[in-house]
């Protein structure tokens, strides 16, 4: 039984980073404690009053209902129009990475182009999220994101960067100052972020994010 359990461990666990090949790096980036695959939750559309009070009349605007939606074409057409206006497709899954030095090494081995990260920060990166509709919202994204640790004050990002990708997608980089130390005693850290009307909140198992018994954050 012990032999079978050991055989199931991915090859990258038994090698140093320098010994990794491209396949090891890809396996690490597919499934490891630093990598989370999540389906964003979609937030409801804002009412006109909520948009006005927030100072952004375009935020969280749903589809219009047209003439049918106000009942001019009959009750059946009205119900259909309202259903279409409120229907929201399930968001596609995204990847959230805790961009430690180990993760960046894996990205290089795998031939990926990763965003530049200042070592003075913890970096959490959300990949392939729908591109925000406005390009002046980095400050807004910073105000609706944090790292949550049990019994401690939430850690807010110092900076947020929005990087345009392909096919209407974006990479969003969240930078948290390392002057607030995260330790093994924190056990689990929840990353919470809202991007437009989408919301992600994966948990990271800090105890598992170790290499040779040293935290790799």
Name every feature range the model reports, one short phrase each:
Residues 2-7:
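Boundary at the C-terminal end of the N-terminal hydrophobic targeting segment
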Residues 8-217:
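PEST-like low-complexity, intrinsically disordered acidic/proline/serine-rich tracts
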């Amino acid at each position: 039984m012990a032999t079978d359990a050991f055989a199931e461990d991915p090859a990258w666990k038994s090698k140093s980073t320098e010994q990794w090949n491209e396949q090891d790096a890809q396996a690490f980036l597919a499934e490891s404690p630093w990598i989370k695959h999540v389906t964003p939750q979609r937030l409801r559309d804002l009412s006109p009053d909520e948009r006005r009070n927030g100072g952004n009349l375009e935020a969280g605007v749903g589809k219009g209902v047209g003439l049918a939606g106000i009942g001019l074409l009959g009750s059946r057409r009205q119900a259909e129009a309202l259903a279409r206006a409120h229907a929201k497709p399930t968001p596609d899954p995204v990847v959230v990475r805790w961009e430690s030095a180990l993760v960046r090494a894996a990205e290089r081995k795998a031939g990926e182009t990763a965003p530049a990260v200042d070592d003075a920060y913890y970096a959490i990166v959300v990949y392939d999220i729908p591109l925000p509709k406005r390009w002046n919202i980095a400050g807004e994204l910073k105000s609706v994101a944090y790292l949550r640790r049990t019994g401690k004050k939430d850690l807010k990002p110092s900076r947020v960067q929005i990087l345009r990708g392909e096919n209407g997608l974006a990479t969003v980089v969240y930078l948290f100052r390392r002057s607030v130390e995260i330790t093994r005693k924190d056990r689990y850290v929840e990353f919470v972020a809202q991007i437009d009307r989408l919301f992600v909140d994966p948990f990271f198992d800090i105890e598992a994010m170790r290499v040779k018994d040293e935290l790799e954050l």
